[in-house]
Every structure is written in structure tokens, then in C-alpha cells.
Swiss-Prot record:
Residues 489-498 have a biased composition (Basic residues). Coiled-coil domains are critical for microtubule binding via the formation of a two-stranded coiled-coil structure in homodimers. Residues 1149-1164 have a biased composition (Basic and acidic residues). SUPFAM superfamilies: Tropomyosin. It comes from Danio rerio. GO terms for biological process: centriole replication. The gene is cep135. Residues 13-66 are annotated as: Homodimerization. The keyword Cytoplasm applies. This is Centrosomal protein of 135 kDa. The keyword Iron-sulfur does not apply.
């Protein structure tokens, strides 16, 4: 069974496939394996055939695409060749540019070398000049010293008998009248035969001439070098032409080589002609500019000659002024004494000024201390005012918030009141309606119940209004609550009233509305309580602010009492008064606002019209407050600005005060130094005076000789004190003179250095002037030579112009013929290029169409193969379905699995069917596209036929053009014969042109060199003019400086010599005073020895007196004892009288000795 079923299945599949392929002949079961094998071979062969066709199509396509592949390589090759040519041209240009730059740099290096050589030469000249000037200055200084040593010296005899000579003391000689002028011949002062500068400048001129000759030789070498460079450039041009010919041969397609070479020759000829024209124009312009420069140089020569004459005259004037300077020196010596006297006066005035400044400094320090205290107080007041302003701003912000809050409450309450009024109206209307309705219906039953209910509602409304007004009036009594009374009064006759159902519903609604109104009133009462608490807070803040304002006012008054001294305090007081007034006004406005708020709170819920008016008033007040707030802000800004100004003024005053303090400190230091010196001198004086007083006290106790010595010592002490005072004064004057001497010496050194530098600059400028003169003469000679050369060159240029005109005419005729031929050739080439481009485009379109057709055929074959494959799959699937049906019959147990498989296979079948449908639709579309492509191919073929017709016509035109070209070639042969003759002429012209070009280049080089030299000369002339002007100014300044320096030198020299002499005199005086003081000290020591001897003698006399007294008393007692009278004792009185003066002196000495001892102890 299985074998038969397999054979049947194979037969059925094979039969289907044969039917699909169109083989509908009968098939026997016996031939089934053969046919199956043949069928498989057929399928294999068809697939191999299809693969072969595909391979063949691909190879054909690739062979067709070879040209298309090669085309970009060809274009790339052409582009690379073109870029190579461009790079080669760029290389040639870069080489030319490099050679040009190297030539320019070499020329510039040569120019710099020449300039450096010139500068070295000038430097050597200047060094030699400086050395000669230094030698001259050394000789002059030695001569001045010799003359000063030969001057008569003043001799001063000191008190010790010594004689001292004072050097550099200039002796003065007064003459009554001058010597009479000589009547003989006076030689002119201008003649200066032995001038060393002229010889030096002539040598410089000779050296310059030699350098210029060397430069001429160098320029000749440069010309030869330039000619060699021109030859090198010609060789480069020839090599470039050869390279162009090589590249033209290398190029494929395009224009013929002859046409390109002709164009290149024409372009080069045009460039040469344009270059020659430019050179001719440039030469004409250079000739004009050179003529103008020659004229300007002649004018400059005249001006330079006039300036030289002026300078020579100026030289004479300077010589005369030197003589005048010598005369001024004598006057300066006279002026010096006056200067010294004035210096002494100024010293005294300076001392007085120092004392006055000390007093002023003390006053300024007091002022500074007061100002600092004022500033500290002002800063304190400023901080307080700033804090008050901040508090006021905070209060304003709070008030604004309150006002906004009240406005919102006002709006909300207005809305509630309007709603309540509307509800009252509706209630009244309802009640009237109900009254009318119930009155009509139930007059007998309840005639006045509604009226009583309405009256109770009105009473409740009035009660609530009264309660609100009472709360508004009370303001702060929030503990009591009117709600129990309302609640006790409100339900008045609710239980006893019974009506209909409609009336009950309306009454319940009214009761609900009443309860809602009561809740609203309760909320409003709470809101009023909040407002009252806020008002309390505001009142507390107002009290606090008022207390702070009072404190600030008290502080301001205290500051006002303290700050009543200066303008700054006055300003601060004014600002403070303004701020106080503003604060009072702000507080008044704040109180007014609070009163208004109270009034607004008290009359908040009375009537709508009153509330509207009140809100309008509040808005106006708010606007006023905003305006006032803006004014306050403006005033605050003004106060801030004034504060800034005051701070700036304080800073300026503080800076001034700091400067004053620094100056005061400096003056204090100086005054302290002077005070220390003064105190030292006073101490020394007090010590000396004290010593002298001690000495006088000691000498007063001595004998008459000691009295005489005391008088002498007193005289000497007075003389010594006066001498010490003089010594102090002299020391001060010496110190001041030393300082002045140092300053004068520094000034003299500086002026001498500046004089030396100025003299060097003068000599340098004279040398440059002489060099400029020489260069001007050289330039004049060179200009004359150049004018001669230019005249000859102009004649040569005129002949060359005539030759160029002839050659240009011939070239114009040849160029016209050539341009005609070129135009025809270009036109033909353009036509050919357009035809070739069109043909290429048509071929490309044809190729694209064929490629698309092949692709479509391949797609159709692929679709057919896919359809066959899908059909075979469908057949296989159908066979499988049959097998599955047979299995379903045989195997019932696996029915569920098979059903699932069937469902899957059905889904696959459906998808395959959908794919087949889509493939059918695609096949139809492809057929349509193939038909369209066939139509397009037909159209392209028609277009090709038309293009072929055009090509044939173009071929005919080309044949005609070839005939014309042959005729043109014949004409060309004749033209070439003519061109040969023209070329011979051109060769001759080229040879003459090369000569002319060489001559022109040499002339251009020479002209450039001459123009460069002329520009250098012009710049040098301009520089010389500027230098002459500046030198004139410097000469004038130097003259004034020389005169002033010489005067100052004379003054300083004279003052220094006199001060030195005075210093020596003072030193001698000091030595004398020292010797005197030493002698006095020796005398004082001798006197002290004598005093000690006298004291010993006085002690001996005291002892003798005591012994005598004792003996006298004893004698008296003995005489009394013996009975002698007192008269008898008178006989011994001469002894006592003779000795009477002596006892007095010892007693006095005894009395004075302890005093002296006490004085000595005090001194110790």
C-alpha cells in the first residue's frame, strides 16, 4: 500500500509540474522514473542556462562599462597633467620671485654696508674731534689754574702774630676811566686763517670723494652682475618656452599646437610691448622728477649757501658776545655781595617763618582735633538718621500693606453687603407675596402672623446692625458676645405658627438665610477683632516710633549744641533740621493716616454711599501718601547726595589736614632739631655763666688783687659769652654756607657737564654741516654729469621710439590677420566641441537605456524562476495536504496535532498566495515599465537617427571646412613665407631690442640708483634743514645757557673763594678764642691756687685772732683784777684798731665759705 501511494503521489506531482510547463501529452505509469529523471535534468539544464545567460549579460555589461570606467581615469589624467603644468609654472614663478628677492636683498645689504662704512668714518672723525677738544679743555683748565695761582693773594695777620695767605681771593681794581681807543688800523675779526675745523672738513670731503669713487666702481660691478642676471633670465625664458612646447605635445585633444604657439607668441609680444610702454612712461616720469629734483637741489644749494653765510655772521656775533660775557663776569662779582646780604636777611626771615609756622601748626592741630571730634559726632548722627529712615521705610511698607488689606476687605464687604441687600429685597418681596397670598386665602385664620414674622426679622436685622455699630464704637471690647441675645430673640413664634406647606418651606428657607447671615456677621466680627488687634499693634509701634523720634531729636539737639563751630556743622545742622521737619511731617501724616483709619474703621459698614466716599478719600490719601513717599525718597536721595558731598569734602579736608600734619611734623622735626641746638647752646651758656658766677663769688672773697682779677674775669666772661654767641652764629652761618656751597657745587658740576655736552654737539653739528656742503657739491657735479647722460639717453630713446613705432605698425598688421584666422579656428573648434558633447550625451543616454532594459529582463527571469519555485512549493504543499488527509483517515488519535499543522499550512498557503498575487502585480508593473522602456528606446533610436543625420550634415560641413582649411593652409604657406621675412626682421629687431633692453635696463638701474641717491639727498637735505633749525634753536639756547652758566660759575667761584676765606678767618678766630679760653683757664687755676693760699693764710689769721682775743680777755680780767680802769686800756686801742678790719673779713669769709660749699654741692 505504501509503495502504491508513493508511486501515485510522485505521478500526481510529476503530472502537475508537466502541466505547468505545458507538456500535456499522456504519461504512462511505466515511464514515470524516466520522465522524472528527464524532468530533473531539464530543470538543471534550464537553471545552468539561466546562470550562463546571467554571466554573459554581466560580462557584456562589464565590457560596455569599460569605457564608462575609463572615462573618469581619462579626466583625472587630464586634470593631473593640467595641475602638473600649473605647478611647473608656479615653480618657475617662485624661482623668478626668489631670484628677484635675493637681488633686492643683496642690493639692500650693499647699501647697509656703505652706510655702516660712512658711519664708522664719521665715528672715527668724531672720536678724533672729541680727543682734540679734551686736550684743548685740559690745556685751558691748566691755564686757568696757572692764572688763578698768579693772582695776588690776600694776607691776613692773626692776633698771635702769624701771617696766613688766602688763595683764590680775587683782588679788585677800580679805574676812574677806560683807556683811550687806538686810532690805528684794527684788523677785521672775521679773518680766521688758522681754523683747524676747515682742514678736517677738507680731509672728510676727500675721503668722501674716494668713497664715492669706490661706490661708482661697485655700481659698475653691479651693472655687469645685472647684465649677467638678464642673460640668465633670458635662458630661463627659453627653457620655459621649451617646456611649454613639450607640454603642448604631451596634451591630447584640444587646439592644434601651431595655434597655441601663435597665441603664446602673441601674448608674449603683447606683454613685451606693454612692458616697453611702461618702461618708456616710467623713464619719462623719472626724467621729469629728476628735473624737478635738480631744480629743488639748486634752490636748496642757494638756501644752504645763505644759511652758511648766516652761520658765519652768527659766529662773529658769538665772538662779540664772548667779550660781553667777560664784562658780565665783573658785574656778577658785584652782585654776589648783594646776594649774600639778601641770603642773611632770608635766613632771619626763615627763622621767623619757622616760628610762625610752629604756632600755625599748633593751631591747626587743635583745629584737626576739633574737626575729628565733629566728624565722629557727624558720623554718629548720620547713622542715627539712617536708622530712622530705615524705620520710617518699614512703617511706610506696613501702612501700605494695611491699606491694601483694607481695600480688599472693603471690596469683599461691599460684595457681601450688596448680596445681603439683594437677599433682603427678595425676602421682602417674597414676604409681600406671601402676605398677599395668605391674606387672600386665610384672613379669618391668621391675619397678622406674617407681619409679626417680618417685624421679628426686621428687628433682628436692626439688632445685628446695632451690635455691629456698638462693636465698631467699642474697638477693643471683644470679650462680650451678642449672639446669645440674638439667639434668644430670633426664634420668637416658630412653634406656634402653622400654615400651609408652601409657607413652611419659604419660612425654612428664610430661617436658613438668617442663620447664614448670622454666620457672616460672626465672621465679620472676627475680622473686626483682627483689625482692632492690628490697630493696637500700630498704635504701639507709633508710640515706639514717637519715643525713638524724641530720642533722635534729643540726640540731634545735643549734637547741635556740640556742632556749632564750622560750616560743616552748619550744613549737618541744616540737614538735620530738614530731616527732623520731614520726620515730624511723616509722623503727623502717619498719625493722620491712623486717625483716618480709625474713622474708616468706625464708619466702615454704615452705608454704601458713605463707604464709597470714604474709599475715594482713602484712594486720594493713598495717592497723596505715594506722592509724599516719592518726595521723601527724593529728599532721602538728596540727603544721601549731600552726605556724599559732605563726605568728599571731609575726605578732602582730611587729606589737606594730613598734608598739613605731615608738613607740621617735618617742621616740628626741624624745630625740635633747632630747639635741641638752642638748648645745648643755652645749657653750655648757662654752665659757663654758672661757672663764672661761682668764680666771681670766690674772687669777691679774695683780696683787692683778687677784686681786680674778678673785674678782669668778669670782663673776660662777658667777652667770652659774646664770643660764644658769635661762635654759635658763625657756626650756623657756616653750616648754611656749607649747604649752599654744596648745592652751588652740584649746580656748577651739572652746568659744566651740560656745557661740555653742548660744545660737543656744536662741534658735531659744524662737522655735519661741512659734510653736507661737500655732499651738496658732489651731488651738483653728479647732477651735471647725469644731465649730460640723460640728454644722450633721451636722444637714444627718441630713436628707439621711432623704431618701436615701425615695429608696432608691422605687428598690428600681422596681429589683425592672425586674429581673423584665430577667430575662424575658434568658432570651428567650438562647433566641434558642442557636437562631440551632444554625441557623448546621446551615447550615454543610449547606454543607460540599454542597461535598464537588461536589468528589467534579468528581473523578469528572476521573477519567473521565483514563480516556478512557488508553484512547485504549492504542489508539494498540496501533496502534503493529501498525505495528511490520508493520515487523518488512518490515524484518528493524532487528529488534533494534524489539525494544528493544517492550520499552519493554511496560513502558509495564504501567505504564499498573497506573495503570488503581489508577484503578479509586480510582474504587471514590470511589463508596463518594459513597455515604457521600449517606447523610450524607440524614441532614443529616433533621436539617434536624427543625430546621425545631424552628424552626416556636420561631416559634410567638416568636409567643406576641410576644403576651407586647405585653402587656409595655402594662404598660410604664403603667410609663412611672409612671416619668414617678418621673422628675419623680428630677429633683427630682437637683436636691436636686446641691445635696447640692455641699455634700458642699465639706464633704469642707473636711474634707480640716481633716484635713490636723489631721494637720499633729499631726505638728507630735509634732515639738514630740520637739524639747522634745531641747531639754531640749540645755539640760541646754548648761548643763553653759556651766559647764565658763566655768570653762575663766576658767582659761585667768587662766593666759594670768599666763603673759604671767611671760613679760614672764622677758624683763626676760633683758634684765638680757644687759646684765650685756655689762657683764662690757666689763669683761673692759678687764681684758685692763690685763693687756696689766701684761705690758709686766713685760717692762720683766724687762729691768731682767737688767740689774741683770748689773751686780751685774759688781760682785761687780770687788769680788772688788778684794778686798772678801762681808760688805761684805751692805750692799747691802736692795736685793736689796726687789727679791726681783719676780723671782719674772716667772719665774712667764714660766712661765705659754707655758702660756697653749698653751691658746690648743688653744682655736683
Amino acid at each position: 500500500m505504501t509503495m502504491t501511494t508513493n508511486a501515485e503521489r510522485k505521478f500526481i506531482n510529476l503530472r502537475k509540474r508537466l502541466d505547468q510547463l505545458g507538456y500535456r501529452q499522456p504519461l504512462a505509469i511505466e515511464s514515470l522514473p524516466l520522465v522524472e529523471k528527464l524532468f530533473s535534468d531539464l530543470i538543471h539544464t534550464t537553471e545552468s542556462l539561466r546562470n550562463a545567460k546571467l554571466a554573459a549579460g554581466k560580462t557584456e555589461k562589464e565590457s560596455r562599462n569599460v569605457d564608462a570606467i575609463l572615462e573618469p581615469y581619462k579626466t583625472e589624467n587630464a586634470r593631473l597633467v593640467k595641475e602638473n603644468n600649473e605647478m611647473h609654472l608656479g615653480l618657475l614663478k617662485l624661482r623668478e620671485e626668489k631670484d628677484r628677492i635675493s637681488r633686492e636683498l643683496k642690493a639692500y645689504i650693499r647699501k647697509l654696508d656703505h652706510e655702516t662704512s660712512d658711519l664708522k668714518f664719521l665715528n672715527n672723525q668724531y672720536v678724533q674731534k672729541v680727543r682734540s677738544l679734551e686736550k684743548d679743555s685740559n690745556g685751558k683748565t691748566e691755564r686757568i689754574l696757572q692764572l688763578q695761582e698768579k693772582n695776588m693773594q690776600a694776607v691776613v695777620q692773626t692776633p698771635g702774630g702769624k701771617k696766613r695767605s688766602i688763595p683764590f681771593r680775587r683782588q679788585r681794581m677800580q679805574t676812574d676811566e677806560l683807556l683811550p681807543s687806538s686810532g690805528g688800523y684794527v684788523p677785521p675779526a672775521v679773518a680766521q686763517p688758522d681754523d683747524p675745523y676747515i682742514a678736517d672738513l677738507l680731509q672728510v670731503a676727500d675721503d668722501r670723494i674716494q668713497e664715492l669713487q669706490k661706490e661708482v666702481a661697485q655700481l659698475k660691478l653691479d651693472l655687469e652682475r645685472a647684465q649677467g642676471g638678464i642673460k640668465h633670465l633670458n635662458k630661463q625664458v627659453e627653457e620655459r618656452d621649451k617646456e611649454i612646447e613639450r607640454l603642448n605635445r604631451a596634451l591630447d585633444g584640444g587646439r592644434p599646437h601651431d595655434v597655441i604657439s601663435l597665441e603664446a607668441q602673441n601674448i608674449s609680444n603683447e606683454k613685451l610691448i606693454a612692458h616697453l610702454n611702461l618702461q618708456i612712461e616710467y623713464l619719462q616720469e623719472t626724467n621729469r622728477s629728476l628735473e624737478q629734483r635738480v631744480d629743488s637741489l639748486q634752490q636748496k644749494k642757494k638756501t644752504v649757501s645763505s644759511e652758511v653765510a648766516d652761520l658765519s655772521a652768527r659766529n662773529q656775533e658769538l665772538c662779540q658776545e664772548l667779550t660781553q660775557i667777560d664784562q658780565l663776569a665783573q658785574q656778577l662779582e658785584k652782585d654776589k655781595e648783594m646776594v649774600l646780604e639778601t641770603a642773611d636777611m632770608e635766613l632771619q626771615e626763615a627763622k621767623k617763618a619757622i616760628q610762625r609756622q610752629q604756632r600755625e601748626l599748633e593751631g591747626q592741630e587743635e583745629v584737626i582735633s576739633t574737626l575729628r571730634r565733629d566728624m565722629a559726632d557727624g558720623d554718629h548722627v548720620k547713622d542715627q538718621l539712617r536708622n530712622q529712615l530705615l524705620d520710617l521705610q518699614d512703617q511706610n511698607n506696613k501702612m501700605e500693606g494695611l491699606i491694601h488689606f483694607l481695600e480688599e476687605d472693603k471690596k469683599r464687604l461691599q460684595d457681601k453687603i450688596e448680596a445681603m441687600m439683594q437677599e433682603d429685597k427678595e425676602m421682602v418681596l417674597e414676604l409681600e407675596r406671601m402676605r398677599a397670598r395668605h391674606g387672600m386665602c386665610g384672613k379669618d385664620h391668621s391675619p397678622s402672623r406674617l407681619d409679626a414674622f417680618v417685624k421679628s426679622l426686621e428687628e433682628e436685622r436692626n439688632y445685628y446692625r446695632e451690635e455691629v455699630e456698638r462693636y465698631r464704637l467699642v474697638r477693643g471690647r471683644t470679650d462680650r458676645s451678642p449672639t446669645p441675645v440674638g439667639r434668644g430673640r430670633s426664634p420668637r413664634g416658630r412653634g406656634s405658627w402653622h400654615g400651609k406647606r408652601d409657607g413652611d418651606a419659604e419660612l425654612s428657607r428664610v430661617v436658613k438665610e438668617r442663620d447664614e447671615l448670622q454666620s457672616v456677621l460672626l465672621g465679620f466680627e472676627k475680622h473686626m477683632e483682627d483689625i482692632q488687634t492690628r490697630v493696637k499693634l500700630l498704635t504701639a509701634e507709633r508710640d515706639q516710633l514717637s519715643s525713638q523720634c524724641q530720642q533722635a531729636q534729643e540726640e540731634l539737639r545735643r549734637v547741635q549744641r556740640e556742632l556749632e563751630s564750622s560750616e560743616l556743622q552748619r550744613r549737618i545742622r541744616d540737614d538735620r533740621e530738614q530731616t527732623e521737619a520731614e520726620l515730624q511731617r511723616v509722623t503727623a501724616e502717619r498719625d493722620a493716616l491712623r486717625d483716618r483709619l480709625k474713622v474708616a474703621h468706625s464708619t466702615a459698614l454704615t452705608d454704601r454711599e458713605q463707604e464709597e466716599f470714604r474709599f475715594l478719600d482713602l484712594e486720594n490719601t493713598i495717592e497723596k501718601l505715594e506722592r509724599e513717599k516719592a518726595d521723601l525718597r527724593a529728599q532721602v536721595t538728596v540727603l544721601k547726595e549731600s552726605r556724599v558731598v559732605v563726605e568728599k569734602e571731609l575726605k578732602a579736608q582730611s587729606a589737606v589736614l594730613l598734608q598739613n600734619v605731615e608738613e607740621a611734623t617735618q617742621q616740628r622735626v626741624e624745630s625740635s632739631a633747632l630747639r635741641l641746638l638752642q638748648e645745648q647752646m643755652e645749657q653750655s651758656l648757662s654752665d659757663v655763666q654758672h661757672r663764672l658766677s661761682v668764680k666771681t663769688n670766690e674772687l669777691q672773697a679774695a683780696h683787692q688783687q683778687i677784686d681786680k682779677l674778678e673785674e678782669k674775669i668778669a670782663d673776660l666772661s662777658r667777652h667770652g659769652s659774646s664770643q660764644k654767641d658769635e661762635v654759635v652764629i658763625l657756626q650756623n652761618t657756616i653750616a648754611s654756607l656749607d649747604r649752599e656751597k654744596d648745592t652751588l657745587q652740584d649746580a656748577v658740576d651739572q652746568k659744566t657737564e651740560s656745557v661740555v655736552l653742548l660744545q660737543q654737539e656744536v662741534h658735531r653739528k659744524e662737522e655735519t654741516l661741512l659734510e653736507v656742503r661737500l655732499t651738496v657739491t658732489d651731488l651738483e657735479n653728479s647732477l651735471n654729469q647725469l644731465q649730460a647722460v640723460l640728454s644722450s639717453r633721451e636722444r637714444e630713446i627718441a630713436s628707439l621710439r621711432r623704431q618701436l613705432d615701425q615695429s608696432q605698425e608691422e605687428l598690428f598688421s600681422v596681429s589683425r590677420d592672425r586674429e581673423v584666422a584665430l577667430r575662424e579656428n575658434r568658432r570651428l573648434q567650438d562647433d566641434l566641441a558642442t557636437m562631440t558633447r551632444e554625441n557623448q550625451a546621446v551615447h550615454a543616454e543610449m547606454q543607460e537605456a540599454l542597461n535598464e532594459r537588461d536589468e528589467l529582463k534579468l528581473r523578469v527571469h528572476s521573477y519567473i524562476s521565483e514563480v516556478a519555485r512557488i508553484e512547485s512549493l504549492m504542489a508539494a504543499k498540496e501533496q502534503e495536504n493529501r498525505d495528511m488527509l490520508e493520515r487523518f483517515r488512518s490515524i484518528h488519535t493524532e487528529s488534533e496535532d494534524k489539525e494544528l499543522k493544517l492550520q499552519q499550512s493554511e496560513g502558509l498557503n495564504n501567505s504564499i498566495r498573497l506573495e503570488l498575487l503581489s508577484s503578479d502585480t509586480e510582474r504587471r508593473h514590470l511589463r508596463e515599465r518594459v513597455s515604457l522602456q521600449d517606447r523610450e528606446i524607440q524614441e532614443h533610436l529616433n533621436a539617434l537617427q536624427a543625430y546621425e543625420a545631424q552628424v552626416s550634415s556636420l561631416a559634410r560641413a567638416m568636409s567643406r571646412l576641410e576644403e576651407e582649411v586647405q585653402a587656409a593652409r595655402a594662404e598660410k604657406a604664403s603667410v609663412l613665407a611672409d612671416l619668414a621675412s617678418v621673422r628675419e626682421l623680428c630677429v633683427k629687431l630682437d637683436s636691436s631690442k636686446e641691445l635696447t633692453v640692455r641699455q634700458l635696463t642699465s639706464k633704469s638701474m642707473e636711474l634707480e640708483r640716481v633716484t635713490g641717491e636723489l631721494e637720499d639727498v633729499r631726505s638728507e637735505m630735509e634732515l639738514l634743514k630740520k637739524q639747522l633749525g634745531s641747531e639754531r634753536l640749540t645755539v640760541r639756547n646754548l648761548e643763553t645757557l653759556l651766559s647764565t652758566n658763566r655768570q653762575k660759575e663766576f658767582q659761585t667761584h667768587i662766593s666759594a673763594s670768599e666763603k673759604e676765606s671767611e671760613l679760614k678767618v672764622l677758624k683763626d678766630r676760633l683758634a684765638l678764642a680757644d687759646s684765650k679760653t685756655a689762657g683764662h683757664a690757666r689763669e683761673v687755676s692759678q687764681l684758685r691756687g692763690k685763693v687756696s693760699q689766701l684761705q690758709t693764710e686766713m685760717d692762720v689769721l683766724k687762729r691768731q685772732l682767737t688767740t689774741e682775743r683770748f689773751e686780751r680777755e685774759r688781760a682785761v680780767q687780770e687788769m680788772r683784777r688788778q684794778g686798772l680802769s678801762f681808760s688805761s686800756l684805751r692805750s692799747s686801742s691802736p692795736l685793736s684798731t689796726s687789727l679791726s678790719p681783719r676780723p671782719a673779713s674772716p667772719e665774712r669769709s667764714i660766712l661765705r665759705t659754707p655758702e660756697r660749699s653749698t653751691d658746690k654741692t648743688q653744682d655736683k
